[in-house]
Amino acid sequence: GPMGPSGPRGFQGPPGEPGEPGASGPMGPRGPPGPPGKNGDDGEAGKPGRPGERGPPGPQGARGIPGTAGIPGMKGHRGFSGIDGAKGDAGPAGPKGEPGSPGENGAPGQMGPRGIPGERGRPGPTGPAGARGNDGATGAAGPPGPTGPAGPPGFPGAVGAKGEAGPQGARGSEGPQGVRGEPGPPGPAGAAGPAGNPGADGQPGAKGANGAPGIAGAPGFPGARGPSGPQGPSGPPGPKGNSGEPGAPGSKGDAGAKGEPGPTGVQGPPGPAGEEGKRGAGEPGPTGIPGPPGERGGPGSRGFPGADGVAGPKGPAGERGAPGPAGPKGSPGEAGRPGEAGIPGAKGITGSPGSPGPDGKTGPPGPAGQDGRPGPPGPPGARGQAGVMGFPGPKGAAGEPGKAGERGVPGPPGAVGPAGKDGEAGAQGPPGSAGPAGERGEQGPAGSPGFQGIPGPAGPPGESGKPGEQGVPGDIGAPGPSGARGERGFPGERGVQGPPGPAGPRGAGDAGAPGAPGSQGAPGIQGMPGERGAAGIPGPKGDRGDAGPKGADGSPGKDGVRGITGPIGPPGPAGAPGDKGESGPSGPAGPTGARGAPGDRGEPGPPGPAGFAGPPGADGQPGAKGEPGDAGAKGDAGPAGPAGPTGPPGPIGNVGAPGPKGARGSAGPPGATGFPGAAGRVGPPGPAGNAGPPGPPGPVGKKGPRGETGPAGRPGEVGPPGPPGPAGEKGSPGSDGPAGAPGTPGPQGIAGQRGVVGIPGQRGERGFPGIPGPSGEPGKQGPSGASGERGPPGPIGPPGIAGPPGESGREGAPGAEGSPGRDGSPGPKGDRGEAGPAGPPGAPGAPGAPGPVGPAGKSGDRGETGPAGPAGPIGPTGARGPAGPQGPRGDKGETGEQGDRGFSGIQGPPGPPGSPGEQGPAGASGPAGPRGPPGSAGAPGKDGINGIPGPIGPPGPRGRTGPAGPRGPPGPPGAPGPPGPP
């Protein structure tokens, strides 16, 4: 029979239940690289090591050979005073004593006042973009938002194209009704024959038997897609899927290019000296840069002579050294003891005074007389002129370093230091590979799109999910473009100084440059008088010197007439430096300085790092309704269906006369159920369905393995030395340095003219020790001595002026996870699901009598599409389909503009004082400076107050007897003596 018209198009079903959430998507692109770090500030130089204690004195040199005793002269008149003997040669130098053991470290002093902060350096040029940062952990899914109100019903879909009518069969002749045969098996479909001409209307034949159901034809091509209807309400969220397996870590990316170091800022003035801690047992730190020389301290007050110390143990006798250079000429010896009075002779006749005879030749020097007893000390002589400054002696050998002292008790924590500059960013870790894709769920029936509802109010914040494991870092992205240069913000307050770090190991560098020579120490205490030397061997007679200026007659002394002042002797050797003076009391704390004006505005800093990704935006408004598509073209006629099976031939009846046309018979009873049809073929994919509602957020991925630690940044460059700080308060005199080497002997003075020998007076009584003379002119500065003991620290001064703001700190750690964002925009349209299995065939009607197969009729026009039927019930949720292939990674977004710098916070209170740093090794002694020109002689000082008499020293070695001077003219005859005894 002819093909019936197409049924009405069904209504669009209600939206299906959302499928299970898909597997976690691929990891997002890496964030833009952070700005390059800045080099850290140079650390403070180590403190100089404490010098070891002075070693015990070496053994005393061997005593010189005593001179030969002279033959005693004959008793007679008292002889003339002998010429002063020359000073004996200096004994050989004793061996060098063993170096002393290091002294105990002093108790840590209080912390010094805080230094004035240095000026802030200009920011360095912007370095190349650093390596890309790791992706942040995926946030946990928030609770679903409230369901919006249901949208209005959608518009009916577009009317589908009119289907083609099947070929109209030719009406067969009415045959006799045969016996109903058993339905045969469905035969193969034959090829459709060409359409025949319409024949004349025949008589209605008997109803033929129902044919076997034909094979389902291929579905027609999809019609043009109608306009999208409004979006329906979102369905309830599906159950949460299982977390995917963590991906394997990917290969390590290349390290980013190293940024150029910025210029080093100007170094601030040196801070105050911290407390001196006890020397630790660790390796000493690298030698610090020598600081600027301090101001020269004023001369200290003369201390009282100390008591004789306990003699140290005698060291082993050293090898006899080479004889030292000849010492300077000694001072004249005391007059000899007057001889005993001879027996007075008889008084002679007083003769007339004779004329003075010519000077006789100088006789050979007589034998040296025995030394007389030392006479009483004479009155203190006038202060002589300052001698010529001697050349500095050779530099002594450096002593062996002292042993390391025990580690001291850690001091109180030091003040918090300024925040260091950011170091360079390390190389990024390797990227991780994407995890395995989950199975894809079957597509549910497409719902009728409703209008977009008004966004509902935000739901209550959900509980924070457990933080996901850290994802594997992704590949290093290309460096992004530099952001716009932002305006410089207000200077921030200086941050609290951080605690000092632990002492680092001793560096392997060479010793630093020698330090500047130290300031001259205070004059030492006057030494004890030396022992009187033994009489030396008389030397050869010297040439007669030029006549010296005649001195003024002295006032008559108690012990006799004062002789003529002799010439000025050569300068003596420089005295050994005295002991260290006591530290003076700490000065009062200075007034609090006024707060300085804010500094100039600095250069804008480098662009800041890209911020974290913001929450997904709210759903956009629905798009405008699209234009209706063009009507599809009429499809080509399909191939003719196969011919049905030929029925069994009926019995041949007699040909009767044609009767009148009968009325149309009524429908027969329903036929028996036919055989099940063959399975339908899979049709071509239908058109893409409408976008479903957005699915709930996917589960939080498991924490990936920890990325490899990037290489450590290179150490910053050492900055140039800063300007010298302001001069501090004048400190107390430091300890005296070690004794300098003996100076070279000065030129020998011109011998003065021998004065007239006065009449020896009676031996006077021994007088009191004279008062100490005034201090001489300060000598030239000797080589730098070892560092003295550190004095107690002064009180902590007032807080300094607030410095310029510090550099921006490192980027803080990510904060806690925020509340989940709103549902994202709808995802892309899913693939169409596979066609379901064909349903069972309907019950066939009662078979009619088979008629002959007529020719195929022409295709009629397709009927109009009927109205859509009511929506059927929602089917169950299909199984989850396999996940689609991973899409390509999106392009990297542009770097946002740098935000304005925030206002500076209020400066916090200063932190507690930090622990003192470890004591550094002592710096190498600097070379001796060039000798300066001799200073002008100072004015003679006033007589000082009588000092406390010092202890009398042991007698010095006996000096040699000097050569005999020229014989003087004979004196006038003496008065006659008293008569002798009978």
From Swiss-Prot:
Q: What else is known?
A: These protein fragments were extracted from fossils. The tryptic peptides required multiple purification steps in order to eliminate contaminants and to increase the concentration of peptidic material.
Molecular function in Gene Ontology: extracellular matrix structural constituent conferring tensile strength
Q: What does this protein do?
A: Type I collagen is a member of group I collagen (fibrillar forming collagen).
Q: Which domain of life is it from?
A: Eukaryota
List residues, modification Phosphoserine: S81, S586
What is the protein's major site of localization? Answer: secreted
Keywords on record: Calcium, Collagen, Extinct organism protein, Extracellular matrix, Hydroxylation, Phosphoprotein, Repeat, Secreted
Q: Which PANTHER family match?
A: COLLAGEN ALPHA, COLLAGEN ALPHA-2(I) CHAIN
Looking at the UniProt entry, the stretches that span the membrane are: none
- UniProt PTM: Prolines at the third position of the tripeptide repeating unit (G-X-Y) are hydroxylated in some or all of the chains.
Subunit field text: Trimers of one alpha 2(I) and two alpha 1(I) chains.
Q: Which GO terms describe its cellular component?
A: collagen type I trimer; extracellular space
Q: Does the keyword section mention Ion transport?
A: no
Please give a single GO biological process term from the UniProt record.
extracellular matrix organization
Tell me the protein's name: Collagen alpha-1(I) chain
- Residues of the region (Disordered) are 1-982
- List, as start-end ranges, the regions of compositional bias called Pro residues: 143-155, 792-802, 838-853, 966-982
UniProt lists compositionally biased (Basic and acidic residues) regions at: 39-53, 889-900
Could you tell me where this protein is found in the cell? Secreted; Secreted, Extracellular space; Secreted, Extracellular space, Extracellular matrix
Where expressed (tissues)? Forms the fibrils of tendon, ligaments and bones. In bones, the fibrils are mineralized with calcium hydroxyapatite.
Homology family? Belongs to the fibrillar collagen family.
